[in-house]
Amino acid sequence: MFKNSAKVLTRLCSSTYNISIRKYPAHPKRHYRKTGVVTSNGKFEITLDQRKLKTPKGAPFFVESEPLAIAIATEWDAQKDIIDRSRMHLTALSSTVIDNPNNLKKTDIVNYLVNYTSTDAILYQSSEEKRLKDLQVAEWNPVIEWFNKRYDVNLEPTDGLEVPTFAPGTVMNVSRYLSSYNEAALQGFMFAVDTLKSVILTCACVDRFITPEKAVLLARLEEEYQLGHWGRVEWAHDISKLDLQARLSAAILFVYFNSSNAFVKQKMSI
């Protein structure tokens, strides 16, 4: 009886208020048994059984780092009954590099990251709650000081709403550092910055000053502080934190794999 009443109510609401129910496409089922990596002309491609992987635009999927290719093949192999692309961050980043859906050039990405620095999350500290401000100063300021020393800049935190002003040379120094990376690695930078809302924390991760777990904790500092007062829904907040850690870890690995000439050495039988 309850099911019938629910159906009637849904039908009446939909017809009266013209409510449209959004239907999301179902995840495709896994259609392959095993994954592999093949190499050709210094490029590495991913195979699903005997078929080579393609990008969303239908272009041949390839990377120039063997460790990255193995990691991507592992992502596909980790899919069970269905293929959940939303959790395959290395695959998504590599496809973005190949397809370049937004037609971004290297200078576009560098400018985006440099401009983001002026609105970096950890430069804006609380002006209302003293305990929160003290926590931010204790946890965020050491990373800001490291960033200033590492890149020869002078960024200062603020507890107001005004955008911090940069000293002469700041933009040039940060741009020079970011421009030393190729376009693929910069896509990883951009993904990490969008995850953390912080260029400073991203650079600290890439340079191994802090771990991805620590970076996520610092990015969520105010949220964690509020949860300490109001309580938390364990599974919901834990899932959110772990999702950020997965996204950030994938981004940092993507930067590493596209910034080094690392290859996997296979054992040779004698």
Model-derived features: positions:
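N-terminal mitochondrial targeting presequence
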Residues: 1-27, 270
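Short cationic amphipathic helices and targeting signals
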Residues: 59-63, 121-124, 131, 201
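Mature, matrix/stroma-exposed regions of nuclear-encoded mitochondrial and chloroplast proteins
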Residues: 154, 212-216, 223-224, 230-270
